[in-house]
């Protein structure tokens, strides 16, 4: 739980972050028994962090560790970047695994936005109808490596730009 503030900040700032937490043994987990806690310092941290992470998983099957690590790394660093969290029970941490039998993660091909042209035209229409348009520019421009394209857009539009506070 001590990492929550940092994770929330990473989520809001689109910063990759990889958190690994320990959990009580699987046998000591409440697993829907209607209790708040059964094991020593047990907390369903995944439920707590789901809304401030791109990916959060309880690794309850030792043979799935490779999958979860690879997926978490992928999610943290692709698309809009952000934090990920893996929670690993003590008995899973101590389990011997056969590296050759570990299941990996294969990302799905990125989907193209088939409505992008329509969306851009709608934005242009809104800008043309606006009495006092302003462009709000955030850190996503820098993260996407689109500084040059953004500068060209600003020059083309000729409207005021407001940037976020750093």
Locations of the language-model features?
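N-terminal alpha/beta PP-like core and its mobile active-site loop of ThDP/TPP-dependent enzymes
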Residues: 1-166
């Amino acid at each position: 739980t001590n990492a929550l503030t940092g994770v929330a900040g990473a989520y809001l700032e689109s910063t990759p972050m990889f958190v690994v937490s320990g959990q009580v043994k699987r046998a000591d987990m409440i697993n829907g028994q209607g209790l708040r806690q059964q094991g020593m310092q047990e907390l369903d941290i995944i439920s707590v962090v789901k809304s401030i992470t791109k990916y959060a998983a309880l690794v309850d099957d030792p043979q799935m560790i490779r999958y979860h690590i690879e997926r978490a790394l992928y999610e943290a660093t692709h698309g809009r970047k952000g934090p990920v969290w893996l929670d690993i029970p003590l008995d899973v941490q101590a389990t011997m695994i056969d590296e050759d039998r570990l299941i990996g993660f294969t990302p799905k091909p990125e989907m193209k936005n088939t409505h992008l042209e329509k969306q851009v035209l709608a934005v242009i229409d809104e800008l043309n109808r606006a009495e006092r348009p302003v462009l709000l520019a955030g850190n996503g421009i820098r993260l996407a490596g689109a500084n040059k394209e953004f500068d060209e857009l600003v020059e083309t539009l000729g409207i005021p730009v407001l940037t976020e506070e750093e």
